[in-house]
Regions:
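Acidic (Asp/Glu-rich) sequence patches and key acidic residues
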Residues: 1-134
């Protein structure tokens, strides 16, 4: 069974269930000291808990940034640690690739939301500049 993590309307991460669970657990471990509720949400989204579904499409920019930061940190820990117990050596490279794909999707979503926020701020400033004109 595959897990499904909706990042945006256009970005959806769908790895094998064991990869989905493994990655969410690793991110939750890093995330827990900073945001225990969000870490619990990740853990509650594993395949054995709810069938492996998590929807991040409506999270705010700050939460998305925190997820990206902790995902990158968890990825770095996994990459430095190398092959560990419970992961077959032949699947390790695929796990890293899938994990990196999620990090890339989170980064893309963050950049898109930052650009949207900047455009809205520019539009807002332009509207108020018109109000101040003589």
């Amino acid at each position: 069974m595959a897990g499904t993590l909706e990042v945006t309307e256009d970005l959806c991460w769908m790895p094998a269930g064991w990869v989905f669970d493994n990655v969410l657990e690793r991110i939750a471990d890093v995330l827990y000291p900073q945001d225990s509720a969000l870490a619990e949400l990740l853990l509650a989204s594993r395949t054995d808990a709810n069938g492996g579904y998590l929807d991040l499409r409506d999270v705010n920019l700050e939460t998305l940034g925190l997820l990206l930061e902790t995902a990158n940190s968890a990825y770095g820990c996994l990459a430095r640690a190398g092959i560990q117990e419970g992961v077959s050596p032949e699947f390790y490279a695929g796990l890293l690739t899938q994990f990196q794909d999620l990090c890339d999707m989170l980064r893309t979503a963050q950049q898109a939301r930052m650009e949207k926020r900047e455009q809205q701020a520019e539009k807002h400033r332009g509207t108020h500049a018109d109000d101040a004109a003589p």
